[in-house]
Amino acid sequence: MHTIYSENWKDYELVDAGNGKKLERWGNTFTIRPDRNAYFHTVLSEDEWRNKVDFEFIENTSTSGEWVQRNSEAENEWQIKYGKAIFNIKLTKFKHVGLFPEQQTNWDFIQNKVQKEHKLLNLFGYTGASSV
């Protein structure tokens, strides 16, 4: 078996996770989103999370909710970079931001395997990031 893992990404960081949520940094913007896989305890305190967060997603149902702005100066749309790619980040009512950072290893794999003279049609790319 070959293990693939993500290298450091300057504009994204999973800062902490636990108690059913994850604290993420997208460029200079911090978000809290529910995550049922975060069933363990956080490393950082609740106060540390609150001092960092710009937006928190509050679920209304299992399929929708709303973002609550915790920092009045934060903008609800911004950009981040990965390599030469620039991604537009926007808060959605489905708790997503338009990009799935866990796909980074797939982007690297595709970039390493597909040469410039090849054309790629990604029929399964929810955000389109793998097609960039």
Indicate residue ranges for each PLM-predicted region:
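Non-catalytic substrate-recognition/targeting regions of SAM-dependent transferases
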Residues: 8-25, 31-101, 108
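Functionally constrained cores in energy, signaling, and assembly domains
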Residues: 26-29, 107, 125, 132
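Conserved SAM/SAH cofactor-binding pocket of Class I
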Residues: 112-132
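Conserved alpha-helix/loop element of class I SAM-dependent methyltransferases that forms part
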Residues: 101-117
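N-terminal accessory targeting/assembly segments
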Residues: 1-6
